[in-house]
Amino acid sequence: MVSVNLPWELVEEILCRVPPQSLVKFRTVCKQWNSLFDDNKFVNDHFVQSQPQLIFRTESKIYSVAVNFKGPRIEVHELPLAIPGLKSEMPIRLHDYVDCDGLLFCTSYFNGVLIWNPWLRQTRFFPSIHRYPVTYDIGYDNKKQYKMLDYYKCEGDSSIKSIIYEIGLYSKKVKDLESDSTWSIFQSNSVSLNGTLYWAGVDVNNGIFIRSFSFSTEKPRTFCSLPFMYDDDNVLALAVFRKDRLSLLNLCNKTSEIKIWLTKNNINDREVGLEEDVVWINLMTVLIPNFPKFSFYWYNRPDLTYFLDNDDAKRLVICCYDETDQAYIYIVKGDMFKKIKIDQYEVLSDYSRPHFHTYIPSLVRPSRVKEDNKN
């Protein structure tokens, strides 16, 4: 058989679509292939092509769950817990991790943040946290300085306190977030898009707003409103689509009707997003038979996470628990519906249910996070 040398541009295009768990095995093929892992353009292009996955932990293991739409079926991978650079006496809190641009940020029982790429098996640890947070999110400013926002509601009033940690700079700021009594930040999970945080809030008239927090200005603001009203029985979940748009799931607990909303245009500029500039479209409305009911409180994240297929926005993946506390994945497109049990799931020793998080696998190295040795 005669070998054919493909144009290098075509090779890059093909490799951009290979999942990272497979791609890392190809590093030894040749020096040119290995060099792609240091090519920022290739890493970013690969990240845009990557399909979202789910990540969760049991009592002793941590798993990723990929959806193969041929079938469809799920593929569960156990991630190594022997994390390089992590001392055995310093266990990370595997239920406390957030995704930001393909990196997992994990808080720990010891004072610090572990930055982890499970597919590259690379970590970086920053001992910059002076108390461990209750609720936190990760983003970065216009200089690509990663920061952590630890926020909590104050008892007795509507104010929201926050601590902003500059990861790697060994500094923190304690400040009051600008807020009022007309909205709540805890009506959905938060997501990070281009370094800025977004979440859904509800005003006293049950109008739904998307709030944002810029790590450049260190101020929250109303990003836009949504074209429907909120109901106390509904569950909201926010997600990032194709790294440049926001989507919102609105589940009616009474009818099990699910509506998916999507921003019509890309959100490219992190400082621009006036209410009149953001247009939402109702992407789909689905009704899943025997879909479980949910409870949601301000101090808890929704017991539901979801994402849209990068290659087909009309294909929806939802992960949640049923009434027996068993975890399932629901795959929906039009009239097609499939429910798949996650066999590896188990209730934790404290009888709590582990949270499922959406995670986009990447080739991003933890070393991209800047560090300043000034104390």
UniProtKB/Swiss-Prot annotation:
InterPro entries per the UniProt record, alphabetical: A_thaliana_F-box (IPR050233), F-box-assoc_dom_typ1 (IPR006527), F-box-assoc_interact_dom (IPR017451), F-box-like_dom_sf (IPR036047), F-box_dom (IPR001810)
Natural source organism: Arabidopsis thaliana (Mouse-ear cress)
Record-given protein name: Putative F-box only protein 11
Entry-linked CDD domains: F-box_AtFBW1-like
Pfam families: F-box (PF00646), FBA_1 (PF07734)
Annotated SMART domains: FBOX
SUPFAM superfamilies: F-box domain
One GO cellular component term: chloroplast
Signal peptide: none
Record-annotated F-box domain positions: 1-46
